[in-house]
Amino acid sequence: MPKYYCDYCDTYLTHDSPSVRKTHCTGRKHKDNVKFYYQKWMEEQAQHLIDATTAAYKAGKIAQNPFTAGPPKPNISIPPPTMNMPPRPGIIPGMPAGAPPLLMGPNGPLPPPMMGMRPPPMMVPTMGMPPMGLGMRPPVMSAAPPQLNPK
């Protein structure tokens, strides 16, 4: 009868049966050996990556560290304020001339929506009214109407 060999533990089990393999694989020593095996493998992969990067750098295939120069400076220019003219309603001072006016909320203009977000709703519900879509639904009718006078 063939014996089962465990590569992680470098040992033969007494015989090849599912119960013996299951018992062995749930043991503490086997689990420690598996963990050690994969830790060693990850260290070897990391060292290989470091060696390959170093060789490529020495060969001139990789430029200097792009992170040492710092982030690129944004090209921001703030337009000068308009003299002798008050800002129009819904327009924030300093906004580009072609920008649309912002929506007016109860506390002034609302900020523009963030990327990936819906714009705010146009209609604000009044007190006592549920928001749109949250009202009461009509009762659901069953397939057959109920009989009032059964015979």
Swiss-Prot record:
One GO term (biological process): mRNA 5'-splice site recognition
Primary subcellular site in the record, as a coarse category: nucleus
Zinc finger region(s), Matrin-type: 4-36
SMART domains: ZnF_U1
Matches recorded under Pfam families: zf-U1
Keyword tags: Metal-binding, Nucleus, Ribonucleoprotein, RNA-binding, Zinc, Zinc-finger
Listed GO MF terms: mRNA binding; pre-mRNA 5'-splice site binding; U1 snRNA binding; zinc ion binding
GO cellular component: commitment complex; U1 snRNP; U2-type prespliceosome
Domain of life: Eukaryota
Location in the cell: Nucleus
Family annotation (InterPro entries): Matrin/U1-C_Znf_C2H2, Matrin/U1-like-C_Znf_C2H2, U1-CZ_Znf_C2H2, U1_snRNP-C, Znf_C2H2_sf
Subunit structure: U1 snRNP is composed of the 7 core Sm proteins B/B', D1, D2, D3, E, F and G that assemble in a heptameric protein ring on the Sm site of the small nuclear RNA to form the core snRNP, and at least 3 U1 snRNP-specific proteins U1-70K, U1-A and U1-C. U1-C interacts with U1 snRNA and the 5' splice-site region of the pre-mRNA.
Family matches, as PANTHER family: U1 SMALL NUCLEAR RIBONUCLEOPROTEIN C
Biological role: Component of the spliceosomal U1 snRNP, which is essential for recognition of the pre-mRNA 5' splice-site and the subsequent assembly of the spliceosome. U1-C is directly involved in initial 5' splice-site recognition for both constitutive and regulated alternative splicing. The interaction with the 5' splice-site seems to precede base-pairing between the pre-mRNA and the U1 snRNA. Stimulates commitment or early (E) complex formation by stabilizing the base pairing of the 5' end of the U1 snRNA and the 5' splice-site region.
Family assignment from sequence similarity: Belongs to the U1 small nuclear ribonucleoprotein C family.
Protein name as annotated: U1 small nuclear ribonucleoprotein C
Organism: Anopheles darlingi
